[in-house]
A protein has these predicted regions:
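Repeat-based scaffolding regions
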Residues: 1-113
Length: 113
């Protein structure tokens, strides 16, 4: 049977609306396995992990997303995700260094400090 992404997304969203985060995460992961280019789903999965109080796993998803945005040249989007990470993990020096680097690339020297 062919993969029907739209149907799979609807099912995942339905699970979220029913409060079934763990099942929704599994559904989103299956979608990502079949369509790894849809990195925006990593944000959704990360948010679901955070909602379930699994911060380490949520941070992993956000980190993957930020790295994908950097690879694709979407520095502003990467900055937004790294800022999200820094709010959840206030002790991450690596995140702050990455933010400073991206701010510099964007010509935002004041923010880099």
């Amino acid at each position: 049977m062919a993969f029907q992404k739209a149907r799979a997304l609807q099912e995942a969203e339905k699970l979220v609306s029913q409060g079934k985060s763990a099942q929704a995460i599994k559904q989103y992961q299956e979608i990502l396995d079949k369509d790894p280019a849809d990195v925006s789903l990593l944000n959704t999965v990360g948010d679901l992990y955070i909602r379930d109080r699994n911060v380490p796993e949520g941070l992993k998803q956000f980190q993957k997303l930020a790295e994908a945005y950097v690879r694709e040249g979407f520095n502003v989007k990467a900055i937004a995700i790294y800022r999200k990470i820094s709010k959840l993990d206030t002790n991450s020096v690596d995140t702050l260094l990455k933010l400073a680097e991206l701010y510099q690339l964007q010509g935002l020297s004041r923010e880099a400090r």
